[in-house]
């Protein structure tokens, strides 16, 4: 049933891609955004910074972002406005001038208690400004202390059938993300990059370019985490593949994959070969592995220092989508927290190595035996 739905979705996405994206309305284009600007002096430690290449929508008192591309980049911050129990249920976004944004962010990084760390999050397919913010907050809250956080927002159409639009837009946004990363590495020497889904494409591209342009600055990126990355698996894990660039300079690189990820199954049908965020063997470039089937654990990668590739299928979040299990389950968040804070991960099992390639799997039973809590 899922496979039939996947084929229908692909056919409809292909048909819709020929329609093109309509132009923004005149009211959106002419809306005045000056009233949305604030000052960096009011930014608090719990606020989240953002850089958006989506078009700012200033037609209402609340700042929003429309699913259109904009070369007029928006820099700003978001303040939680919800209750004490659910502070991020509602929020207030404000713009900053770029120079004020950079200065305020670096001041937050340098403040006592922040450990001079910076977290950068890139959202994925079918996620808008709000979705990206919520994921960034989920990751940020796993730290035991307040870490300055930047949510990078690119113009997703936020539709199941908008896959081709989104794939095109993340490629279009690449140059903007590259430039932002070059700015950020000048101000701190301890950066963690986290990307979800299609966001992994931009993360990998930005790191590869920065390695080539400024190796010393690139070394300030200490950790890279790819959650359900919608990227060609062989391109990353093969000999001399992108994983070597990601690990360059002694970085820690963690990749989460699953054989239950439905959007990545659809992506594989569009691209023809396995995705990095999938452990399914049936469409591997290593053709002899294909007989291992869907459950053959083909997420294994080269045995390199700093690299962990983790199969997450046992971290079931419910429903059929399963594209965000790492964020949506207790064991997924616990493992992510351990990576962020350099803690042990006793709930991981090491997969039997094959041809010099290694990896892990999450085991819910081991987690429940080890811990009874659920990281927020």
Give the predicted meaning of each segment.
Residues 117:
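Alpha/beta-hydrolase fold active-site loops
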Residues 10-13, 368:
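Processing junctions and N-termini across compartments
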Residues 15-18:
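C-terminal motif of bacterial Sec signal peptides marking the signal peptidase cleavage site
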Residues 1-8:
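Bacterial N-terminal signal peptides that target proteins for export
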Residues 120-124, 196:
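The conserved beta1-alpha1 loop
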Residues 20-114, 127, 133-149, 153-189, ...:
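Lipolytic serine-hydrolase domain surface
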Residues 177, 195, 199, 203:
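Gly/Ala-rich beta-loop-alpha elbow adjacent to hydrolase catalytic centers
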């Amino acid at each position: 049933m899922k496979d039939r739905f996947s084929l229908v979705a692909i056919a409809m996405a292909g048909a819709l891609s020929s329609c093109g994206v309509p132009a923004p309305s005149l009211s959106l284009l002419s809306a005045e955004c000056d009233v949305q600007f604030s000052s960096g002096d009011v930014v608090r430690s719990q606020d989240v910074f953002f850089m958006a290449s989506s078009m700012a929508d200033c037609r209402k008192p609340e700042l929003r972002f429309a699913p259109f591309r904009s070369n007029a980049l928006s820099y700003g911050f978001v303040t939680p406005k919800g209750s004490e129990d659910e502070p991020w249920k509602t929020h207030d976004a404000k713009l900053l001038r770029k120079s004020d944004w950079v200065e305020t962010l670096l001041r937050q990084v340098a403040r006592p208690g922040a450990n001079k760390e910076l977290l950068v999050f890139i959202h994925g397919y079918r996620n808008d400004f709000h979705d990206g913010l919520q994921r960034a907050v989920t990751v940020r809250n796993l730290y035991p202390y307040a870490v300055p956080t930047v949510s990078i927002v690119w113009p997703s159409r936020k539709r199941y059938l908008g896959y081709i639009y989104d794939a095109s837009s993340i490629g279009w946004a690449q140059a903007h993300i590259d430039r932002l990363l070059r700015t950020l590495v000048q101000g701190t020497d301890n950066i963690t990059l986290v990307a979800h889904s299609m966001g992994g494409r931009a993360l990998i591209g930005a790191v590869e370019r920065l390695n080539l342009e400024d190796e010393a600055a690139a070394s300030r990126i200490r950790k890279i985490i790819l959650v359900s990355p919608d990227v060609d698996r062989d391109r990353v894990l093969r000999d001399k593949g992108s994983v070597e660039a990601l690990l360059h300079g002694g970085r820690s690189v963690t990749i989460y994959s699953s054989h239950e990820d439905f959007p990545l199954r659809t992506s594989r049908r569009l691209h023809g070969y396995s995705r990095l965020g999938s452990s399914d063997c049936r469409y591997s470039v290593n053709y002899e592995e294909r007989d291992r089937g869907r459950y053959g654990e083909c997420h294994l990668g080269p045995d390199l220092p700093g690299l962990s590739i983790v199969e997450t299928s046992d971290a079931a979040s419910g429903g059929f989508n399963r594209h965000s299990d790492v964020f949506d389950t207790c064991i997924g968040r616990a493992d992510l927290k351990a990576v962020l804070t350099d803690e042990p991960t006793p709930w991981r099992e090491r997969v039997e190595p094959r041809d010099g390639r290694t990896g892990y799997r999450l085991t819910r039973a081991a987690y429940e035996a080890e811990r009874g809590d659920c990281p927020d």
